[in-house]
């Protein structure tokens, strides 16, 4: 029983500190505003109606009766918000506007008019956390001391005039599934707001996000129509953007965006701060393959941030801004009949005063597709159905209508193949969809998003260089007729090939515009920014750590061990450092095999590396099996206040590790299984169990 008391004390002692760290996440590094979100004449072609952070004033000025707030990390929630706004306007006559939730104040929500409605489309990021742009709203609305302009307390139901709709985007492989929408919904209800319809939840972990969204919104619209006395009408396409070809400009004009991410980059004067909306064009100073087996490649790259204001801490993430593969750009332009005018200059303007143009303008069709639009993503059923009206013939139209209305048929023909929009349409007909307005494509496809990778170096050891470790994705799905190629990792492989002497890089049949717009990436450069993380080493290096990192999940732990080796070289006391690493075979994909030997020499007995090779015997062995085999070691380190880290696959490995750890605690302490699970939950909430996982 004394052992249990010790662990309880450990858990409780760090609970407060961990909670503070959790709830202040993101407030110490502000997210820069998107330079394309503000629309002066060069962006939307119209002046914005004021710069007020007062959403009620904004709605009054622009004649809106429906605002759709979004909290988005990767762009999906923003896309859903835009789709809801468009559908609400076209089907029900709502005067809608889409709003980034961080761009408005919340203290006056108690003044929200009863004849208007607010939507909250909120993604949950990581382990139940708000997205970067929703941190302040989350802290405000769920705070114990929340107060509004009209005064009063929560007991006074200050939001009684607020009608709202809620949809959350989550992943069931994480413990705190859809925590953001659930907690915000509970807070709004507690404050007296009236939810219309049920709070929807989409599950990316189950692969049903899109269908969850579609299934939720129809009964939601019915409930909203009744609550606001809306009349449904036949929807027809009404463009959000006006796209015009500008014959007075050519791609050679220095005012035309050819892939530059910001105006500063266009003008050749990029300046910091570098952020999610303003990348640094960083030189790649080293690139190599850690292994190459059949169609599997794993890259190690060193990216220089010397001479910039970019900084990172061990455990942070680096974002790579990708470029679409040339073959997919060509496919897209051909499918939509744009090949012959790919280099024509276009201007894009928002028809509505509140509409944000997602890509810079003026630009060209080619640049828009290559650098700004997510043309390689799996296509949604709803978007495919919108193209029926523009089908090249009746037979094609009939097929698209069927795909749009029959989710099982769509799943069989499109989802199972992991088709992007151009591939999906090519599977239906060889005829081009020349009548599809380019504005519809801008509206229906997300803006291309940066991809995040765990940094695999220590900022203490190399503050001016960031290491990344990435497996190049090239996968043939069961039943699929083509190989699905990762956009960013194949781009990185092409850069590696070019840097290492290949004059015509062609990774897995993909070609890329490696030199970038106007050759601004020449010399092997890539656009990047840094995202800070709470996945951190203990401040006291003598504290033990246990790391679980199979495959490229070992990336941050290379940085952790690199840092501890440097601290030991300085004469600091370094505690037990245990790594559980797994891969297929020791002579095939054992990442950083030689480096571990060097670190072992530097750290001596304090470093212990335990391996699991899944394909060296008939019975597959994974890291969770090794964890169980070393239960006594794990239990002893936990008693010494060890921090437990997991990095890698969320759907299988991370879940299994979580389960096994609970079993270890229970078995080693003679406790019921439920108590072991409870202790793991306490470790999570206190910050002594940390995850950097993906699905």
UniProtKB/Swiss-Prot annotation:
- Mostly located where? endoplasmic reticulum
Q: FAD-binding FR-type domain: which residues?
A: 277-538
Bound cofactor: record note = Binds 1 FAD per monomer. Binds 1 FMN per monomer.
One GO BP on record is:
ergosterol biosynthetic process
Q: Which residues bind FMN?
A: 72-77, 123-126, 169-178, 204
Q: Please give the Pfam families that the UniProt record associates with this protein.
A: FAD_binding_1 (PF00667), Flavodoxin_1 (PF00258), NAD_binding_1 (PF00175)
Question: Top enzyme class of this protein?
Answer: oxidoreductase
Cofactor list: FAD; FMN
Chain segments carrying region Disordered: 497-516
Record has Metal-binding as a keyword: no
Q: Report the EC number(s), separated by commas if there are several.
A: 1.6.2.4
* Topology feature Cytoplasmic, residues: 32-695
Write one Gene Ontology MF term: NADPH-hemoprotein reductase activity
Those parts of the protein on the Lumenal side are 1-8
Q: Which reaction does it catalyse?
A: 2 oxidized [cytochrome P450] + NADPH = 2 reduced [cytochrome P450] + NADP(+) + H(+)
Which family does this protein fall into?
Answer: Belongs to the NADPH--cytochrome P450 reductase family. In the N-terminal section; belongs to the flavodoxin family.
The name this protein carries in UniProt is NADPH--cytochrome P450 reductase
Q: Which organism is it from?
A: Emericella nidulans (strain FGSC A4 / ATCC 38163 / CBS 112.46 / NRRL 194 / M139)
User: Which gene specifies this protein's sequence?
Assistant: cprA
